[in-house]
């Protein structure tokens, strides 16, 4: 039923379906365990023979209601909340990869994800090749190997604000028999639904726009249910061969389109944890209820500020896909017709110190490591989020030394413009 509803209605009423006499507002199930009357019923839960709850490290009714809402917003068959966006990306990859495997990823991605793929998962025996997402299909295909398991990209890159050609990435991935995983954090499903363009799996840092108020850290993995794992059974044995920890159960045979999500919860969440608290899920749900309203305001404010910066002689360049002269504008018209998000990147004429002086002069707009919530904030990635990367890696990730990431909130845009103008006057 939910898939027939508008995204606005799903934001408000999706996920939690109260029965007669139950709480109209999503309750917080602040409990580690759930009581059953007999041992057989509990045993069936452990054997995945029936649905239900027995330990919050795997599943919790509050968390599941919120995950169900996000799945409906994205148009997926199922979703799982994680304790951070980084955890979501790790789980999405590790659910189909093991030691000796390989992935391909866009080099236009968040610095933390770049480090996760380029350094951390290598310690688990999983290799990653980064590619320029703007390269030709033939060039990107050269990065694939016989042991490649996935292709990864961000709908709107952080912090470069480039727009991914999702259909192109999907064609490349599917031609090699692997799924495409898209981090859809910045546009959210309000402004883009990657599944409609061929994506197979979507991830989110729900800490950002979905929460919208910087009150909780979280993530989410959503599956479209469209990738045929059995058609590539040799490549994905974790899904298509018996799992000895569940008495020889095979996920694709037992759960069909829910195979990927079931394994994610029953195996990875069981063994690795990283589930958010029910209270954090409750806070996330409060944010989701106004997501459709806030995204419109974010985009409206950001468009006005980007247009101002584009015309100011002290600004060297601006990347915001809503600008007609932006290199990503054509892709934005296709994938983001109703707006992208409130995040933009720009550079000032001068040196790195010029950017620092501008940021230090801001009074209303805060310098924080966060991005994409109700309050406007600014960051210098080369000095902060991407400081672990070398100059060469910064260039590969599309992060110029002068790049300033501005996250436009939902305040009065005239107040924000006034703050930006006075800061520019101080450089």
Q: Where would I find each of the regions flagged by the language model?
A:
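Conserved PLP-enzyme active-site core in the AAT-like
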Residues: 2, 8-17, 79-311
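PLP-dependent enzyme catalytic core of the Aspartate aminotransferase-like
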Residues: 118-119, 127-128, 146-149, 294, ...
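Well-ordered beta-strand positions enriched in small/hydrophobic/aromatic, beta-favoring residues
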Residues: 151, 219-221, 318, 344, ...
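Glycine-centered tight turns that cap/initiate beta-strands
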Residues: 75, 147, 314-317, 364, ...
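N-terminal "arm"/small-domain region of PLP-dependent enzymes with the aminotransferase-like
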Residues: 2-60, 68
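Short hydrophobic/aromatic beta-strand micro-patches
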Residues: 222, 345-347, 407-409
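Conserved N-terminal alpha-helix of the aminotransferase class I/II PLP-enzyme fold
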Residues: 38-90, 112-120
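Conserved small-domain helix->loop->beta segment predominantly found in fold-type I
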Residues: 272-275, 279-281, 286, 290, ...
């Amino acid at each position: 039923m939910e898939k027939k509803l508008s995204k606005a209605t799903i934001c408000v009423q999706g996920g939690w379906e109260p029965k007669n006499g139950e709480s109209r507002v999503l309750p917080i199930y602040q409990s580690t365990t759930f009581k059953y009357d007999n041992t057989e019923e509990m045993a069936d839960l452990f054997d995945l023979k029936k649905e239900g709850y027995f330990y919050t490290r795997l599943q919790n009714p509050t968390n599941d209601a919120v995950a169900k809402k996000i799945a409906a917003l994205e148009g997926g068959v199922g979703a799982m909340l994680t304790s951070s966006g980084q955890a979501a990306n790790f789980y999405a990859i590790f659910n189909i990869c093991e030691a000796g495997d390989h992935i391909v990823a866009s080099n236009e991605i968040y610095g933390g994800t770049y480090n996760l793929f380029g350094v951390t998962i290598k310690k688990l025996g999983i290799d990653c090749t980064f590619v320029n997402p703007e390269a030709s299909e033939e060039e990107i295909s050269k990065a694939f190997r016989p042991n490649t398991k996935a292709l990864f990209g961000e709908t709107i890159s952080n912090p470069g604000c480039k727009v991914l050609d999702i259909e192109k990435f999907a064609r490349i991935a599917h031609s090699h028999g692997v799924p495409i995983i898209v981090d859809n954090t910045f546009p959210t499903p309000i402004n883009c639904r990657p599944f409609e363009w061929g994506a197979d799996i979507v991830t989110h840092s729900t800490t950002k726009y979905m929460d919208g108020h910087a009150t909780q850290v979280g993530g989410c993995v959503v599956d479209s249910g469209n990738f045929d794992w059995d058609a590539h059974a040799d490549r994905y044995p974790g899904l298509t061969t018996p799992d000895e920890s569940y008495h020889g159960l095979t996920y694709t045979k037992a759960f069909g389109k829910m195979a990927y999500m079931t394994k994610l919860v029953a195996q990875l969440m069981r063994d690795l944890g990283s589930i958010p608290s029910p209270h954090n899920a409750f806070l996330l749900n409060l944010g989701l209820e106004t997501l459709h309203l806030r995204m419109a305001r974010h985009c409206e404010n950001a468009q006005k500020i980007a247009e101002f910066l584009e015309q100011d002689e002290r600004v060297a360049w601006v990347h915001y896909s809503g600008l007609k002269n932006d290199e990503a504008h054509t892709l934005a018209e296709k994938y983001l017709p109703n707006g992208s998000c409130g995040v933009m990147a720009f550079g000032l004429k001068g040196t790195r110190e010029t950017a620092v002086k501008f940021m230090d002069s801001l009074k209303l707009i805060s310098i924080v490591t966060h991005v994409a919530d109700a309050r406007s904030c600014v960051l210098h990635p080369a000095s902060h989020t991407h400081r672990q990367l070398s100059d060469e890696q910064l260039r590969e990730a599309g992060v110029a030394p002068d790049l300033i990431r501005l996250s436009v909130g939902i305040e009065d845009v005239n107040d924000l413009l006034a703050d930006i103008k006075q800061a520019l006057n101080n450089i």
